[in-house]
Structure formats: structure tokens, C-alpha cells
Amino acid sequence: MIRNLYYEEQALMILNQNCLPEELVYERCERPEEVVAAIKGLKVRGAPLIGVTAAFGLAMAFSGYSGTGEARDVYFSRMKELFAATRPTAVNLFWALERMERVYRENHHLSPEELARRLCQEAQNLYKEDIRVNEAIGEQGQELLGEGSRVMTICNAGALATCGYGTALGVIRSAARRNKIEMVWACETRPVLQGSRLTVWELWQDKIPVTLLTDNMAGYTMSLGKVDAVITGADRIATNGDTANKIGTYSLAVLAKYHGIPFYVAAPLSTFDWNIKQGGEIPIEERSAEEVRTIKGSCLTVPVVDVFNPAFDITPEHLITAIICEKGIIRPPFGAAIKIWGREGE
């Protein structure tokens, strides 16, 4: 499976996902500011991968840093805030940064060289854990799919959005290994086209049957009886089950409910925000108008037209059939169940 990022010679090599599917381009980041720019610019995307990338970037900030004492504490806080400001909706980012801060606090008395080594090791741990977690999500979720399943998805919740294997696409991969998948319907996912550029490319590489749809074809496809389940990823899940995911997810959930199709969310426990009670509290990132006005530099509309471009929407819990995580399947009523799962995941 393709590597999204890897650490070598005190530099982070990242796969620039903006270049896919036309080119496979790795970029070398030698400074934390370059990693920040890569996250903001969507060269790296997907909630789990954003978190791990930020962890590596934070570790990189201490490679060669010789400060000690209070100056080092101030430097750590500044670097952490730099990464925390990149993508406000993806809670995995803050979870990973908290993991890194815990390691820093436990080891800040050590030499600069040893502290840097331990921070890098924690980032590596996060990377390996994410792959294991995604494989577990896949195994749990495939149980929900029968033979000949036709599954619809949006955005990219696959290996490209994680450190490997994927969440929603992890479920599809695990089901495909058991010959359960007849077709994956991939919504193109305007405005950045993660579905057409990334999900289709991933599934094509794995020889999993896939058909591309424009986003506004989803409802009609469901009405024809061609969809057995909808599976999406998540960027943040509130403790009542309300879920933030790529813009367009809410529309799919409404359509699935109307047509009597199960709607599943696949996400690790690190995507749950234990401090948020319901979806209205989740911050929704708004991105550049140019993402909507243009595609690959070509203008699609009046160049100065006003644009509303939220990157995510909120799917209320009553539209979700079940949430698939690494420990198992969470079913309604979500509030009580999520609290139990949260305690078990501590």
C-alpha cells in the first residue's frame, strides 16, 4: 500500500495529494512551517493523517533545537499552537498534539537530543497505531455488509486519509477481501474532488469495482435500488453521535434515510470529542472561495461572485444507523453507548 508520509534524515516526506491522480509526487519538508503549509494547503488531508502529520512536524521542530528550561517550554507551546491552527474541525489533530504534549511534559528535563528522539518515537507510535486501528475498523465494519453489496461513499476516507488502509474504505477493503463488494459508488465530492481524484484512484489501484458519480446523482441512484449501504468517514463526532464530515455527507444521510438505506460512519475513537455534547458545538472550517470558483486554475463562473464554502457539515445522530470504530459497532441510542465506549478507550 502506498505511503502517505515517512520520516527520514530529519525531514518529513509527504505525498502531495493535490497532484493525484495525475502524478505521484513526494515533497520534502525540513522545517515545521513547511509541514503546516502542507496541511493547510491540502497536500496532506484526512483527519487521522492530519493528526499524525502534525505530530511528526512537532517532533521535527525539536530536531536540532538546543533550548532548555522555560525557553523550551515556550517554544513547544508556540509550535503546538502553530499546528493546532491548521484545520479546526478535525479533532484527531488536537488528540495527536495532546499525545505529543504528554510525552514532552514527561521528558522535558532530558537533554535536547534525547527529548527530540522521544518526540519522534511518539510520532512513529501514532503512525503505527493508526494503521492497526484502521485495519480493526475494517474488520468490524465488514460484518455489516453482505455478499454483493453496493456501497456509496463520499470524499476520501481511505489509505490516503490515514496512515494506511482507511476507515470507510477500510471497511470496503475488508469486505472486498471476502468477495462481498459488487460496486462502490464514489461521489465526486465538490469542490476539491477528493472522491473522483483520490477514492476512485485508491479503489482502482486495489482492483475494487468503482463507479464515479457527481454528487447530485446520489439520490437518483438510491431511488433505482442500486445502493445497499452508505459508509463515510468522520472528522469529529460529538458525544451524542452528531458527526462532522466532508460537506455533502449530511445530504447523503438524508437521502439514505428517505430511501431506507443504512448509513454508517467509520471512525477511530480518537475522532470522538469527549468535550462536545452535540454537533452545533463543532467548529466548521470555511475555505477559500477560489476552491469553488475554479478547478485546477480554470474559472467556472463570474470571477468575483460571492461564495459560501464550508468544508464540512453536521449529520445529526438520528440519521446514522451505526458508528463503526476499532472496538466494535456503536448503535443507537448513541449518547449512553458512546460514554461507555469512551471509558473503555481511555
Curated annotation (Swiss-Prot):
Keyword check for Amino-acid biosynthesis: yes
Metabolic or biological pathway: Amino-acid biosynthesis; L-methionine biosynthesis via salvage pathway; L-methionine from S-methyl-5-thio-alpha-D-ribose 1-phosphate: step 1/6
Binding annotation for substrate: R45, G46, A47, R87, Q194, N245, K246
Catalytic activity: 5-(methylsulfanyl)-alpha-D-ribose 1-phosphate = 5-(methylsulfanyl)-D-ribulose 1-phosphate
Biological process (GO), any one: L-methionine salvage from methylthioadenosine
This enzyme's EC code(s): 5.3.1.23
InterPro entries the UniProt entry points to: IF-2B-related, IF-M1Pi, IF_2B-like_C, Initiation_fac_2B_a/b/d, M1Pi_N, NagB/RpiA_transferase-like
Active site residues per record: D235
GO molecular function: S-methyl-5-thioribose-1-phosphate isomerase activity
Site for Transition state stabilizer, residues: C155
Keywords: Amino-acid biosynthesis, Isomerase, Methionine biosynthesis
Pfam families cross-referenced by the UniProt entry: IF-2B (PF01008)
Family: Belongs to the eIF-2B alpha/beta/delta subunits family. MtnA subfamily.
Functional summary from the UniProt entry: Catalyzes the interconversion of methylthioribose-1-phosphate (MTR-1-P) into methylthioribulose-1-phosphate (MTRu-1-P).
PANTHER family: METHYLTHIORIBOSE-1-PHOSPHATE ISOMERASE (PTHR43475:SF1)
Protein name (record): Methylthioribose-1-phosphate isomerase
